[in-house]
Amino acid sequence: MRAFKVKRDTNETKIHLELNIDGTGKYSINTGIPFFNHVLSSFAKHGAFDVILDVLGDLEIDDHHTVEDTGIVLGKAFESIEKNNIKRFGFAIIPMDEAKATVTIDIGGRPYLVGKYNPNTEKIGNFSTENVVHFFESFSNNAKVNMHFEVTGENEHHKVEALFKAFGIAMDMATQPDERKGIVSTKGII
């Protein structure tokens, strides 16, 4: 079983994460931001990851630190996985009504993000849409993954939810065991 615990305490946030990559999609998520809870739950469910996440952030200021630090902690958990005998690459194209999200992942040890998301609104509930790309920057840098995503559509809720579902499915694909391949790099190391 590939299960990890990450704890991060700063002056801005206190985060406890338990992640089972070989889970069934069970989750208990509390970030203090209802819409963020919702999309992280979609990530866990569709990625078949078991996730326990408790975040206490400085929401009296805004949601930036909570979203950013959650991306950092989730990234650190995924960075911990053994890179031998995994698929390494994952992708998903997910529609949600008029919205569509495409995500591609390479767990190759080289952090890089290309994110194409143009929000039509500043907020979804009390979640700032400007933090969508920043969450994935924080995740990518700390997981050391290369990630590309593109989101189209009109309804902001649909766009972001489709993105997090695609993220879960792509990460599930990339982290799947594949005993045939050993280290999936011609360099011999990831």
UniProtKB/Swiss-Prot annotation:
Location(s) in or outside the cell: Cytoplasm
GO biological process: L-histidine biosynthetic process
Its EC number(s): 4.2.1.19
Keyword Manganese: no
Protein family: Belongs to the imidazoleglycerol-phosphate dehydratase family.
Domain of life where this protein originates: Archaea
Keywords assigned: Amino-acid biosynthesis, Cytoplasm, Histidine biosynthesis, Lyase
Gene: hisB
Amino-acid biosynthesis in keyword set: yes
Broadest EC class assigned to this enzyme: lyase
Native organism taxonomy: Archaea, Methanobacteriati, Methanobacteriota, Methanomada group, Methanococci
Recorded catalytic activity of this chain's protein: D-erythro-1-(imidazol-4-yl)glycerol 3-phosphate = 3-(imidazol-4-yl)-2-oxopropyl phosphate + H2O
Native source species: Methanococcus vannielii (strain ATCC 35089 / DSM 1224 / JCM 13029 / OCM 148 / SB)
Database matches in Gene3D superfamilies: Imidazole glycerol phosphate dehydratase, domain 1 (3.30.230.40)
Name of the protein described by the UniProt record: Imidazoleglycerol-phosphate dehydratase
Gene Ontology cellular-component annotations: cytoplasm
GO MF term list: imidazoleglycerol-phosphate dehydratase activity
Pathway the protein contributes to: Amino-acid biosynthesis; L-histidine biosynthesis; L-histidine from 5-phospho-alpha-D-ribose 1-diphosphate: step 6/9
Major site of localization recorded for this protein: cytoplasm
